[in-house]
Amino acid sequence: MTTKIKSEEISSIIKERIENFNINIDISETGKVIAYADGVAKVYGLNNVMYYEMVEFDTGDTGIAFNLEESSVGVVVLGSGRTIKEGTSVKRLKKLMKVPVGDAIVGRVINTLGEPIDGKGAIEANEYRFVEEKAPGIMARKSVHQPLQTGLKAIDALVPIGRGQRELIIGDRQTGKTTVAIDTIINQKGQDVICIYVAVGQKESTVAQVVRKLEEHGAMDYTVVVNAPASFSAAMQFLAPYTGVTIGEYFRDNARHALIIYDDLSKHAVAYREMSLILRRPPGREAFPGDVFYLHSRLLERAAKLNDELGAGSLTALPIIETQAGDVAAYIPTNVISITDGQIFLETDLFNSGIRPAINVGLSVSRVGGAAQIKATKQVAGTLRLDLAQYRELQAFSQFASDLDESSRKQLERGQRMVEILKQPPYSPLSIEKQVIIIYAGANGYLDNIPANKVIKFESELYPFLEAKYPKIFEDISVKKAIDKETEAELSKALEEFKINFGA
């Protein structure tokens, strides 16, 4: 027996079907690789792709649209790109590059893309940020006024660094640039400062050594390492500092403090030059492209001290530049010197003569850090730069003149002891209270009778003596941030007592 379907039922079924009709069409704009070499693909067919947009190859590799030409697009490949060849399909992702940020990545070693490379499992990040962001404007900033202590006497006394400052570390290879940066990270322990170390174009073994050193001193607990070694493509090396600064900005914008080290921007500029030349952009001075200044200025301008309305967070940058035979007048060094708020100049001759950290006090400056220096340091190190300059002058003169008058001889001897005081072994940063005490002792003649070669021994024995018998001195300097008459009297008494007992 056949059942008849009423016409109303048919129409209601058709209506229902039409209402629930859903078709999933995935529209993606694709193109084809027409040429590929040295980590750069020339792609045809991505007519609507935007500058800096992410694209995906059907091999699984990702890239960034870097050159937008009339008939093709120049794409820099992130990753090895070994399987990309002519004819490989490429599709637009319609998004810009983002990296994970937040506390989840603190203590980790990551690559340029924010992927973990330390074998400690996946990163569970709650927030992702664009790697290219605008730097804070003038009104969003506040002048630098809080100190960021490095733990190095020569820097904290003579070229002080403030939170939110950009201070360049510049010098030839093997002069201790990375050591200064690592010391600064170690000294941030307990200071509530998150540190980011960006390694660009370094050897994997060198970065592993840095990570091991940070772990030894318990500094990895508040540090992120972004690694783009020499084996990575030029694009990965070029983007690494931007990944690092994006991570730092998260803390800066959340009313916290961060420190970022770029090791080093010379290799960063070389990676950018390599990329630009492969993309056939016109070369300029030293074959660098015309926008190499903008490359570094937009990166370093993102370090800032924010105003109180925005939370008063800060991001301090310590870029490193490697010079060739002390040539600070080369293209990249002069560019970065003009962008930063001062520079710490390390010299090969000083390093080889045993003065370490090998800081050339005459050429090193801090343009804004003076406002951040605590009063106690200002009191003891006020004339130190001038005294050292006069000592260097006298030293040069005394090589030719044998008969020096009494005051010149005393000045020469005092200078020798001050140079000894500023020496410091690597990876042993000092608290600001200890720095103030030893510089006070040197500047006020307490070391004049101590042989120059015994100054380091004097210093190493002085701190335990004061901690045991005069702990209040450390406390007073720490709390008051200055040396008042009472503290000075106590310190003088302690130094006199120690000198009598010191077995030189």
Curated annotation (Swiss-Prot):
The record marks S364 as: Required for activity. InterPro entries: ATP_synth_asu-like_sf, ATP_synth_asu_C, ATP_synth_asu_C_sf, ATP_synth_F1_a_nt-bd_dom, ATP_synth_F1_asu, ATPase_a/bsu_AS, ATPase_F1/V1/A1_a/bsu_N, ATPase_F1/V1/A1_a/bsu_N_sf. ATP binds at G171, D172, R173, Q174, T175, G176, K177, T178. The keyword Transport applies. SUPFAM superfamilies: C-terminal domain of alpha and beta subunits of F1 ATP synthase, N-terminal domain of alpha and beta subunits of F1 ATP synthase, P-loop containing nucleoside triphosphate hydrolases. It is found in: Cell inner membrane. GO terms for cellular component: plasma membrane; proton-transporting ATP synthase complex. It is an enzyme of class 7 (translocase). Produces ATP from ADP in the presence of a proton gradient across the membrane. The alpha chain is a regulatory subunit. Belongs to the ATPase alpha/beta chains family. This is ATP synthase subunit alpha.
